[in-house]
Amino acid sequence: MRFCSLALLLSTAVLTTGEQPGPSAEGGVLLASGWRLRPAGKQVPLSTLPMSAVVSPDGKYVLVLNGGIAPPSISVLDAATASEIGRTPVADAWLGLTFSPKGDRVYVSGGSEAAIFEFTFSRGALTPARTFPTVTKEKPTPRDFIGDVAFDPAGRLLYAAELFRDSIAVINPQTGMVIERFPTGRRPYRILFHPDGKSFFVSSWADGAVYHHETTKGSLIGKIRLGAHPTDMAWLPGVPPGDEKPNWVARLFVAGANTNDVYVAGLTAENDLTLVETINVSMTPWQPAGMTPSALALSADSKRLYIACSDANAVAVADVSELHTRALGFIPTGRYPTAVRVLRDQRVVVLNGAAGTASFIDPPDSDQLEAYSQTVLDNSPYRDKLLEDAGTGPGGPIPSRPDDPSSITHVIYILEEGGLPDEASAPNHHKLAREFVSLDNFHALGGPGAEGQWWATAAIAPDYVVKMGPNSQRLRREGHDFGEGEPAAGPPAGYLWSNAALAGLSLRNYGFFVANRPPEQTADGTQVAYALDPILNRVTCPRYRGFDPAYPDLERARAFLAELAGFEKTGQMPQLIVMRLPNGGADHDSALGLVVEGVAKSRFWPGAAIFVAGSAVEEGQRAPALVVSPFARRGVADASMYNTASMLRTMELILGLRPMTTFDAGARQMTSVFQGAPDTRPYAAEKPGPR
């Protein structure tokens, strides 16, 4: 197996910072994450979360599936003019989009509708034709969800990924009936046929593997394990010219969305799959996970591979014309590219999922690609040197190097889920901001949905959360399973508590990733049935109830204070405490006040720091945040631009932890919040509401 890296192409540039998210005087747009957008090409507005695209057989049109917060739709783009010429609504749509071999019909996955929608297509116009239900029940369940769709090469049968049933449904397009089902890996993402039609490949989002199935019976020919979250695939037949003669006859490129890698599997004449190469798309040699390669496209001559790197807002370019892949560079895109396609004239079309746009980009020559690559690097605040020296400077409690000690020995991280509170309903929030530091320019990453919680605990939202979140948020699919046992939802390096456990730190969990007992089974005071993350099994407070809007936060605070009293008796408190206070209003504010007061009056206060962050705020807007500690500055307003990744990185440095992703690694540390000499005056909570 060979390893190819794009990081070695790029030189170091000066880190730049800005003061407010939005258009920047330095060019482009500054994001709340501290990254910048300077997309190449022409930007065409679409709807929300454009996530897949297909070029018509005649090359004149590009169809785009929009599956975000707005009502789902299919956009038709004119390739010649690079403009949207039509948009057709659908009941639901998620990833699957394909033309019939003749190009006169289009098939769209119906997502939570558990159906496939058929349209006729003529001269750029879509007309609804038929609906192919994949279940017989009147109302589909959350498990009945259609993802990718693909025709066999002969155009006779349509194959559909049943995402939460871990199966492939085979539909006869003449009758619209399901004629067969095949089991496959967990969370089948993409279906790709072998050109001979005798077999097909399925990327398993949850298993980190690609499954190779025989076409007629669906029997498993083979399986190859790759990296986390394999998503898109691209097929390249033949062996490149050269003296080396490999034992494979074709290559299968597979994007690993929870890594910085694209995997290259060689297929032998005997149908064996072997990992022959890994294409690393990192911008620098030591960059942590966070590139999120999630979509692939080959150029018309099959010499270039384009790789959509979603979280890096870039497309990586690699030369695959030889036996060993050669990295060429990057192209800057709009925010969160989800798909890439190449037109007949070699222009590159990129869908920008978070921006809701399509970029039409002329094929860059070597000079232009070099300039584009430097732009991509300049757009990121991350640099490898930050892993060994965060640059926090001397005299404060935040170490600059991973192994340096801190004056702070206990970190308490409290995640809220409300917006900026008013003073009448939140006197403790406002009093804490007045007595300690008022963070006037703090931003939550990821927005108010599930993404915000992932950014606040894992320094990234996995591609599963990004792509499934809108469907659940708009209740097209009932319920949600983000992290609560969902095998495809895990982030690249786990969560803050995973990081701490790996480093051997003592840990206590209050309310994260737990299954609650039914209220009628809590007479003994036990609120938690079990932890949903194995790491949390032995460190979770059983009397601290998880998310349940009907349960008061004040009761949660009292459960914590009861354990704090036990810590006082033993003289031992965990080095990291993670706590979820999910409610809002006066109850929540009183609970926070009691927690802070309890810690501030305890023996642990001289070495404690309490970090409070709100996650349920639109990204780019100010979010509630507090830092309460003897080492926090007193009575000041801080206008430094910080975000949830900044808070995570600051806690990591205090605790001696490595960063989880490129986003906390490159985040601005909250050095201006702290002072070198401690002020141990305690905090007195405002009186809580009645019990």
Where are the model-predicted features located?
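N-terminal pro-sequences and low-complexity stem/linker regions of secreted or lumenal proteins
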Residues: 377-691
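General helical structural elements
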Residues: 6, 191-194, 653
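Predominantly soluble domains enriched in secretory-pathway, periplasmic, or organellar proteins
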Residues: 13-397, 404
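Generic recognition of cysteine residues
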Residues: 4-5, 309, 541
